[in-house]
Every structure is written in C-alpha cells, then in structure tokens.
C-alpha cells in the first residue's frame, strides 16, 4: 500500500490504486442463440464477490453495444502481492437471456488487474477474447471491448488505513493494548483531516502514547501511564474544533443606565415649569424681582448650562408699555441656547431672555411708532411722555435705559467687541452733547430774558423752529447710523453707556425722579428738544431693522431646534427588547471596547483556521491533478451504470 513498496517497478507503479472502474463498451462475433441468428446478450462484471450486470441488448446480430460501467474497490495491498489472486481478477461473462429456463453461456474473459496495472499504467482500453468454461473445449466465441481505469479515492484509503491499523491481528498486541489502557472505541491520534473526529476527549486512562515515548524501554511503555490529556488538537491541524464557543447573553438589567438620574431631573423640572406660569406677582414686588445682583452658581444638570427654577433672573418680569411679560415660558424654549461655556447665569443671559419676550410687542407696535414720532403737537407729546415716565417709574424705577428702547436689543455684546462698542458710544455721546450745548445755551438765554423782560412772540417762534431743526438733524443721524450698527451684532447698536451693568447704578425711586426733573427748564416750549436730546428714542419700542432681526431670530431658532432634536434623540431613543441592539444600548464605553476586542480576537482565530483549510484544499487539488486528472474533466457522454446483482 505504501509508495516505497511500489517504487522501482515502472513509471505506472509509483502509486497504489484503491478503485477500478470497468466500462463494458461492446462485443463482436458472438454466437447466435436466438431465432434468426440473433441473441439477447448481456454482460456480467465481477471482481471478488461483487457483481454487476449490464442491460440486455435484444436481437443483436452478434455485435451488441452496452457502454455501461461499474466501479469496484480493490484490496489495499494490490501491488505488494499479498492479496489473493481472485480478489485482484476481473471476470467478464457474456450470456444470452432465455425466456424459459437458464440463461445460455456465450463466453467469458479474465483480466489480472495487478499485471495490467504494472504493465499498462493507469488506463487501458482493449479487446479481450472470450473463452469457454474451464474443462470445456474452446470454441470461437467472439471478443469483448472493455475500458479499465484505475483510481485512488483518498477518503476511502484513509478510512481503510485506520481500520487496518486499529485491528490487532496478534494476541500479544491485544494484551499490550489492555496494559496501555487503549480502548477499542477511543479515537486514534492519526485521524484523517478529511473525516474530523467527533469523539470527546477521554481521560488519562484511555489515552495513547506519543511517538517519542514509544522509543523508551519496554518496561516503561508497559507499566507507565501518560499524564497528558488527549485533546482534539492531537488530530490534524486542518480540523476545526467541533465544540461550540461560549455565548454571552447580555441583558438590560445587568447594566445600570447613566441617564436615569437626569431623566428624573428633567421630569421634575418640566412639572415645575408648568406650575410656575401663574401671575402671582404684583407691581410692588416687580422692582425686587428685577434686581441686578448676580445669583450664585447652583448645581448644574446633565447639559451643564440649565438654570434652576428658583433663579431670580429666570423668574423676573418686565413691564413694557403697561403689558406684563413673564419670563417662565420663554425660558423653556431657550434652555439649550443659554447653556454657555461659563455654565453660570449671567446678565447676558438675562438680556437674551428679553429678546424672546418682547418680539410679540414689537410686532404689534412697530407700525404705529413712525406716526407717533413727529406727527403730534408739543403739548400732546409732553402729556404722553409724562404719563409714560410715571408708568416706567412704577415698573422699573432703577432701570431707565432698558425701558427707553433697550428691550428689543437685549442680546449681550461679545467680549471681543466690547472695546469697539465703548469707543462708538463715546463718539455718539460727544456729538449729542455738542448739539445739546447749542440747544441748552439758547434755551438758558431765553429763560433769562423771560425773567427780566418778556420777549416778543416772534423770538419764541424762531426758537421753536431751531429746536425742530435740531430734532430733525438728530433723527437723520440716527437713520444714517442704523445700517452701520445693524452690520454689527444686535447688542452693539447701543453703546456700553446704556448697559445697566456697567454705567447705571442702582438708586432709589425718589432720587431718580429728582434727577429726571432737574434738567427740565421752566419754559414749556423748550422742553421738547431737551427731552429729545436726552432721549433720542423716547418710545420704548421703535421700528427695528426687520431683515436683520428676522435673520438673527431664524438662525437662532434653527440652531435651537437642531440642538434640541439631537439631545432629545440622545435622551429619548429607546430600543425594544426584540431589537438586537437592545443588548448593547445600555453598555458603557469601556464595556463596548472590551466586547469589540473579544470579537476581533475570535475573528482572527477563525481567519487562521480558514487559511489552513484553504492550504489543505490547494494541496489536495494538486494531488488530484497529478494522480487522477480525468475526474476533473467533464465527459462528453456520461456512461450508464450497470445494475448490481
């Protein structure tokens, strides 16, 4: 069976076949046994005890055609001569089928497969002469054409070798196996890679010795037991382990969510927000609520910038033109926008709230303001301004610059542009003071003249005209500066002098009323340019640049919506238990990293095993191409299979 035993016997005997395929093609010169010189012939193919019969070729004129094949397994030691002659002999018998009685004999031929394999090689097709039965007189019986092909089936050879090796033909061998503890049912260490072993690993009493320990003395091999435990790795390296890998079932209860505390805080804050929309503050409590003292930093929630509901700035109210605006509802919309890197409430955030709270009043009163600017008489404007000043002193006594038009421009100035705004505001104040000096000087002279002697009515009319001209110039300058200021941030339209946290100091209501009444002259006609000079924008709400405010509000709104959507998705996204991602949704970052590393290691091991299998298949394909390349070809005509008898 070994290659070394068959070496040196010709080019065709370098390998030992395991199977032989016999194809009976046709016959000629057969004797006629039927009516009209015909015969119903069929052939019987036999190797050892296996027999196959072809189909019957009816009414053939001595030349039937079958083209049927049969495959036989050869004994393992065919080339060494140890097999019996009958096991290595191919017998071909041609018979005539009889309707009644036994079939009639037409001829027979015998082929020695060992000699054919040694002399002819792998495949041979030739005509063989049919002979009579042994002990009978030879007659002319014709010939039969047979195609004989030797093959080697690696799987059968490997299994056959294992079965022969495990059989103990010697009684001393059986005794030796019992002493060594070798069991008949135990798997062999030399198991083939083609047939992977599914037998589990046995104990140390049932294991066999390695080749190195067989070289030791007989006493040690007979009475010593190996301490090694047999594993599936002692088989071929190409065999994948059949044991299943341990699977870890992850559950949501094994891990604690880090969003639970934040979810409870969000629910409590939303509940308190709904309950805090009641108007319970009176006009006496409003000045205390609009206090400018900065609150202390309180505990921050998950986002890091949300203020608590007890914050005085978030609960402050503003009275604009007699309409009370409460700051609880706008805060819920601008929570994400107020989360700044400083992580603490600031006056900038307070002024940012006024922008959202005063947009409705701006939209309602903006078309009415231009008509109120210059279309009324001086007496009517004085009465309106006095009533408005009284309302302002009641609502915000210490925050006059904010009520004079700063509510609609409540965006906080940037730290980078603070110096630039202060310079612009100083320039504007210097120009306004120069214009005011001209007006007040003339007004003081008019006051002195009125005390000494009454002036004619013509001089009073001229002063009114001059005051109107100065007022028109101030309006033109404001209109010219407005597009330049709109290009800057919204908060930079007014100088730093109008910022209540920089220039305005908190004072009592009485002091503010006295300071307001001091610059008023006794002449009622000259009060109009004076009030216009001190307050260039007398109304708290004036028409704004609609395009700039729309762009700013739209950009802020879209940014807020995007951030709110992202955070809501991060907080509210939940997986169903049937979803495969549910097992990984509650894992932490470190646990996910460990899981990925384990999966990567498992994949690398499987890739190594697949690579070994690919190498084995490549080597096996090379052997097939060398030994039996004909099995890789597609035959032009598939042969018929002979029926087994």
Swiss-Prot record:
Pfam families: C2, RBD-FIP
Residue ranges of the region described as Necessary for interaction with RAB4A and RAB11A, subcellular location and endosomal recycling: 581-645
Coiled coil: none
Nucleotide-binding in keyword set: no
SUPFAM superfamilies in alphabetical order: C2 domain (Calcium/lipid-binding domain, CaLB), Eferin C-derminal domain-like
Start-end of Polar residues biased regions: 282-293
GO CC term (a single one): recycling endosome
Purpose of the protein: A Rab11 effector protein involved in the endosomal recycling process. Also involved in controlling membrane trafficking along the phagocytic pathway and in phagocytosis. Interaction with RAB14 may function in the process of neurite formation.
The protein's name in its UniProt record: Rab11 family-interacting protein 1
